[in-house]
Structures are given as structure tokens and as C-alpha cells.
Design a protein with these regions (language model features):
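Carbohydrate-binding surfaces in secreted/extracellular proteins
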Residues: 368, 428, 493-520
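Short carbohydrate-recognition loop motifs
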Residues: 391-407, 467
């Protein structure tokens, strides 16, 4: 077993906003499908995490613009190695679209584990709930909700004591996994079972990819918020209202209430959708949604991120009702108007709290002296028991090499963090002296098993080489550059400088006194169309 040690230094661009304004996104670097709740003056957001572990990242804020990662809903292997599987889950599977809510002293997260066994059998969409008294954890084991099809579930606590599960199903069949229509059913949260009848309540406005439902009760009405149009550039947020939670729901005639589908790639963000709403203590309202930056011809290596917009409620005519033989009167419901002055997500928006400015500090320096790995580090799937150590060589993260190559459904010695900006510097000090040939260690810009860029040190016949390899979808791995490391003594510093659309790579063999330029690469080679890019140690 080959062992190697690393120290990380990462400097991302620190961003300062205009006085009195905050900058979107509020949570950068692959934090899609945000759901938000408030307890007093504390706000909490949870996001999708797909096949990555720990899963379900939870952020905390006092002001809606400065967010701190405080923990994960899925943070133990025993939560993820049964019916809820993050051990050998396929790429793009795993945890989809959670909802976080607080009720009578307990936090609830409800979400879906999408799992495909790979043997040709139908894929599974297992909806489950976890609970905690403290949002930073520990969180409970997953409670699987049997017989609940679809993805993106919501849990709603009505003021009459009933609790409702809201989910999706394929059009025309309320027992079929998929998206397109929204269903509601009462749930017993003591037994974790659905009870009563199931009701299909809405298929959205245009009937395309209706998903991501959330239920609210305001102004004497039940509101059903959904995402529609797919998670690409036609993404949008729609809303409907009803006097009964089971419907019928009246569509807001001003839908969509949020979208960027009408904006060009010259705007800073696209694909906004999959939203949640929150009321502040003073009665004001805000919305969070996902969005994707337009850094690379409509895409970005940060994937889908979390954005914040103000909103307000305004009366809207939903239909005309006949009140007498010759008289009709309008029926008006209050509906949200998002970003009331512009109707779109803004890069700069007035602060929710004028006395609480935003400061984004993206600098990370990890000397690995703590007993536990920093919360920002992420694995692809649940790591095997002997993947890393912080105690074997204090002050270093020791990774243990594993046989084979990076491939779908496998677990490998790779740990990284979410790329948060297009402009950054990433530096890793590596101690690597393998006994065997063709063992490699270095850094990876990892998008998926089928799309990544490696810069690694490799030993071949007592000589050490630095080489760059690119894996693109549907293509074989290609070596782009290879150079012999003259004078290599087992220690090297690898550095990446990123500037929007290009990565420049450097290395140092003299403890950082000077760096040698290695090569460059267009960032679009590992562009994250939907999920994330992980600058990683490998």
C-alpha cells in the first residue's frame, strides 16, 4: 500500500460588494436546489449533494448573506450503506433536492436517493427523512418512506396538526417514479408512513418537467411552489394557490415568478429555478433559488449555486366569478412578486439588513493539524475505511493509494472541495515516494468519472515524471504533456492559477522558492454543465 502526504493552500478571490449591497450567489460552488428555514433569527439552508459525501451540506446565517457551513445531514457511513446508498451509487445519482423544515424543537430534512444498480433493472427513487435537534448534527438514520414515488419531496406541517408529504410522479400514473405532476398525501411522522388517499394536484403551467414542490400556508391559502422547464436555461419557478391543501389549485396568471429563460448569455446568470421562500421576523420575504453563472459560454465550473432575491406579495386576479345573472367579479389572491423592481436575479442587491454587510472570504489554508477533516473537504461516495489519516503523520493529510483507475460506482483516494470562483490559486505540497512503478499522486480538476484533468507525479523505472492527462466524455484518457522531474527528492509543490477561462499549471522542487511553468488548459474542458468541479488531491 503506497502512502503519500499533502498540505493544501488555496487562495480564491475575495469579493467585496458595493456598500449597502450583497453579491449573488450567496453560497457559491455547486450548491444547487436550496431549501431554507428560519428559527428565530437563525437561517439554515440545505442543498443537493448527489453522489458526494458527506451529503446534504447545511449552512447557517444570521443575515441571509453571510453563510457558514456547519455540518451535513448525511455524515456517517451507517446512514448511507443500506437502502439509502451512497457507497456504490452511480454518477449523477444520490441525493436530489432536499427540503429542510423546523417543527416543535426538531429539524427535518426530506429528500430522495436516486440509485441505479447498473444491471438493467429499473432505477430506484427512495424518499426518506432524517431528523435532528441541532442542525449541525448529529442527524438520525434515514427513515425510508415506502410507496412514495418520484423525487424532490416536501414536508409540510399544517396548523391543524396534520403533516403532508408532497412529491412528484410521472404524468398519468401517481405510482410511477419520475417528474411532471405533483401529488400530496398525509404522512404519519411517528411511524414514517403515508396514510390516507393520494391526490394529484398540479402539473404546472406548461407541463414540462414539473418538480421541486414546496407547500406554504399564508393569507388563509395554501401555496404550491414548483420548478418547471428542466434544470437548464428554460428553468423557471411557478406558483399556484388553493383554499384546500388538496386542491384545486389556481394558477398565478403572472407565472413564471422567476426565470432567466428570456435573457441572453451576456447576463451573469442563467437557469434560475428550484426555489424556496422564507419570511423574516419583521414580515419581509425572500426567495432562494439555484442559478448557473455564464462564465464559459453559458456555463461555469462552479455548477449550480444558491442565489437570493427579495420578494413581496401582491394581489392578482386568478379568475372571474359570476355573482349574479349579469355580474361577474374578480377573484384575487396574493402571489409573490420576486425581485419587485427588476424581475430578475441581480448580481448586486440591497442588503436584507443594512447594518450587516456581506464579506466573502474564500481563502483556505489547511495544515491538517486538527483531529477531524475540515468540513469543506468532500469525497466521491462514502470513502473506504483506510482512505486517509490525519494522525499517522501529524500536519499532513495522508492518503492511501488504491488499485485501478477512476471509474463509475467505485471509491478511490480522492478528496476535494467545491470550486467557488473562476479566478483562484490552488497550491498543494506533496510528499510522494512510492516503492512501485506507475503509482500516481497529484491534483485533479474533477467533474465526473468521465470528465477530469489530472496533473500527477508518476514513477517509472526509478525516474519521476510530471504528466497531465485529460479524460473527456466518450473519449479515452489522453496524455497532454509529460516532463521528467530532475532532482526530485520526494517533495513537490503543485500550483494552479485560474483566470476565468484558463487554468495555468506550475510546479516547484525547491519548497516554493521558485515555480516552473508546466502547461495550460482551457477551463471549458472540464466545464460543469449541471453539478460541480472539484479541485482535488489524488
Amino acid at each position: 500500500m503506497i502512502k503519500y502526504s499533502v498540505i493544501l493552500i488555496l487562495v480564491l478571490t475575495n469579493i467585496f460588494g458595493k456598500e449597502g449591497y450583497f453579491i449573488n450567489p450567496i453560497i457559491s460552488g455547486a450548491h444547487p436546489d436550496p431549501s431554507i428555514c428560519r428559527v428565530g433569527d437563525d437561517f439554515y439552508i440545505v442543498n443537493s449533494s448527489f453522489e458526494y459525501f458527506p451529503g446534504l451540506p447545511i449552512h447557517h446565517s444570521k443575515d441571509l448573506v453571510n453563510w457558514e457551513l456547519i455540518g451535513y445531514g448525511l455524515h456517517r457511513e451507517d446512514q448511507c450503506n443500506g437502502k439509502m446508498n451512497l457507497v456504490d451509487v452511480q454518477s449523477d445519482g444520490g441525493i436530489h433536492a432536499p427540503t429542510i423544515r423546523y417543527h416543535k424543537g426538531t429539524f427535518y430534512i426530506i429528500t430522495t436517493n436516486v440509485y441505479n444498480s447498473g444491471d438493467g433493472s429499473p432505477g430506484l427513487m427512495r424518499n426518506f427523512i432524517i431528523t435532528a435537534k441541532n442542525p449541525s448534527g448529529p442527524w438520525s438514520k434515514p427513515y425510508i418512506i415506502e410507496g412514495a414515488p418520484g423525487i424532490d419531496p416536501d414536508i409540510f406541517f399544517d396548523d391543524n396538526g396534520k403533516v403532508y408529504f408532497t412529491g412528484t410522479h410521472s404524468p398519468g400514473d401517481m405510482n410511477a417514479n419520475g417528474i411532471g405532476e405533483i401529488w400530496i398525501q398525509e404522512i404519519d411522522i411517528k411511524k414514517w408512513k403515508l396514510i390516507g388517499n393520494r391526490h394529484t394536484v398540479w402539473d404546472g403551467i406548461f407541463g414540462c418537467c414539473t418538480e421541486g414542490p414546496h407547500i406554504y400556508k399564508e393569507h388563509g391559502l395554501y401555496y404550491l411552489l414548483v420548478a418547471e422547464g428542466g434544470t437548464g436555461k428554460n428553468h423557471a419557478v411557478m406558483i399556484a394557490a388553493s383554499e384546500d391543501i388538496l386542491g384545486p389549485y389556481e394558477e398565478n396568471q403572472r407565472n413564471p415568478i422567476l426565470t432567466t429563460r428570456h435573457l441572453s448569455n451576456e447576463y451573469f446568470v442563467n437557469s434560475t429555478g428550484h426555489a424556496d421562500m422564507i419570511e423574516l421576523e419583521d414580515g419581509r420575504w425572500y426567495m432562494v433559488s439555484l442559478g448557473k453563472r455564464n462564465d464559459l459560454d453559458g456555463d461555469a465550473n462552479m455548477g449550480r449555486e444558491t442565489y437570493l432575491m427579495p420578494m413581496q406579495w401582491e394581489p392578482t386576479i386568478v379568475k372571474w366569478e359570476q355573482v349574479s345573472e349579469d355580474r361577474w367579479e374578480p377573484l384575487r389572491y396574493l402571489f409573490p412578486v420576486v425581485a419587485p423592481l427588476t424581475g430578475k436575479v441581480e448580481r448586486f442587491t440591497p442588503l436584507p439588513y443594512a447594518d450587516k454587510p456581506q464579506y466573502i472570504n474564500n481563502t483556505v489554508v489547511d495544515d491538517f493539524l486538527d483531529e477531524n477533516l475540515d468540513l469543506r473537504w468532500t469525497f466521491v461516495r462514502v470513502p473506504e475505511e483506510k482512505t486517509y489519516s490525519l494522525s499517522e503523520n501529524p500536519g499532513f493529510l495522508r492518503l492511501y493509494s488504491k488499485p485501478g483507475i477512476i471509474q463509475d460506482r467505485k471509491r478511490f483516494s480522492l478528496v476535494g472541495f467545491r470550486q467557488k470562483e473562476s479566478d483562484f490559486e490552488f497550491e498543494v505540497k506533496i510528499n510522494f515516494s512510492p516503492e512501485k512503478d506507475k503509482v500516481e499522486s497529484g491534483i485533479i480538476h474533477y467533474q465526473k468519472e468521465w470528465n477530469y484533468l489530472t496533473n500527477t507525479v508518476t514513477k517509472v523505472k526509478k525516474k519521476y515524471y510530471l504528466e497531465q492527462n485529460l479524460k473527456e466524455k466518450s473519449k479515452e484518457i489522453v496524455t497532454l504533456k509529460k516532463t521528467i522531474l530532475k532532482g526530485y527528492d520526494g517533495n513537490i509543490i503543485l500550483k494552479v492559477k485560474s483566470k476565468k477561462d484558463k487554468y495555468d499549471f506550475y510546479y516547484s522542487l525547491n519548497k516554493g522558492s521558485s515555480f516552473i511553468y508546466f502547461t495550460s488548459m482551457d477551463a471549458i474542458k472540464t466545464v460543469s454543465y449541471t453539478h460541480l468541479t472539484l479541485p482535488t488531491i489524488y
